[in-house]
Every structure is written in structure tokens, then in C-alpha cells.
Amino acid sequence: MNTNDDKIQWHPAFDAALQIELEDEAEYLEFEPEHLLSKKPMQIDVLVKNEKDVKIKKNIGRIFRQYNIIEYKSPDDKLNIDDFYKTYGYACLYKSETGDVDQIPATELTITFVCYHYPVKMLQRLEYDKKMSIKNIENGIYYLIGDSIPIQLIIIPKLSKENNYWLNNLRNDLKSGGEIRNFIEQYGKLSLIHISEPTRP
């Protein structure tokens, strides 16, 4: 039995063995042991945890299960294929980085992409590479069909102003005056924030 002092370092041994196994084609290969996946700490934009077996009625949350990963793009940013795989990877990492094996079942994961521009190129790649299709559920809400993890796409400007007032107004083209005043008044009614008019001389 190995003690802590003489514990075998398996990963360096594997790396060496792998390179030896592939030495005949080594001129074509580059090996990067313990390659860092990101220059900065990886983080999920928003993680929404739902009580088990609770069905969310709100339109943007009907797809939700117990653990819901959300990727948000600002009005000036666009969603691309690398964003898709990054967020998908985060979901898999979140599932695996738990205390016990399968503590978070894959069946309890969902992924939501929220953006302002319909990602035509990304969806074309997913259709071609992964044979995924897209289904328009209602204004601004789309389901990506064909993966074991439920995935939805939310296009903020296309959301219903009645059903999704807050998200629909989360944009940088609010018209000065009426729209901004109405947005502030609605915030005040919900007591989410308290805004007072500046004192005029």
C-alpha cells in the first residue's frame, strides 16, 4: 500500500507514456500537460436553482429543472458557436464538480442563452454539426431540440412586452422621456428600487 509520502504521481506518468505511444507521429503533435482552460476563473453568468419537482409557470422558466445555467449577452455582444460550447462545458463541469458521484443528475440540468440578436450562424452550425433543430415556442423564446440537456434561446427584443416587461426593457435604446419614466415608475411600484427626483433650485 502506498503512503502519502510515496504516492505515485499518475498524471505525469500517463503524459510520458502517451507521448511515447505516439512518438512515431510526434512531429505533428503538441502536448500541453495540465493545460489551463481559461486565463480567468470560469464562472456561470447566472445559476438558477429550482426546488425539485416544481414546475415553473413563467414562460422563460417553463424549461427549468433543478439546476439551470444561464448565459447572458449584452446588447452590443453577439452569441456565437464558441459561446454555446463554453456554456455547455460549464454545465457539464457544474454537474461533475460536486461532492458525490452523480449528486447532480444530468436530467436535472438546463441551459438558457439570453441575447439581443438572433444567432443565425451559431444555429446553422448546430444544425449541421449536431443535427439540432430550433422550435419557436412563443415570442422571443426558442427551444433547441436534439440534445440530452434541454436548451432554450431567449431573444430579448422579441419578447412580449406584456409578459416580459422587465427583460424587454433591459436594452440600451430606451427612448428618453416616456419610456424611461414608465420603466422607473414600474420599478417603484414593485418596490425593487427607490428613485427620487433630484431637487431643483
Language-model features and meaning:
Residues 1-196, 200:
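Elongated, amphipathic alpha-helical interaction scaffolds
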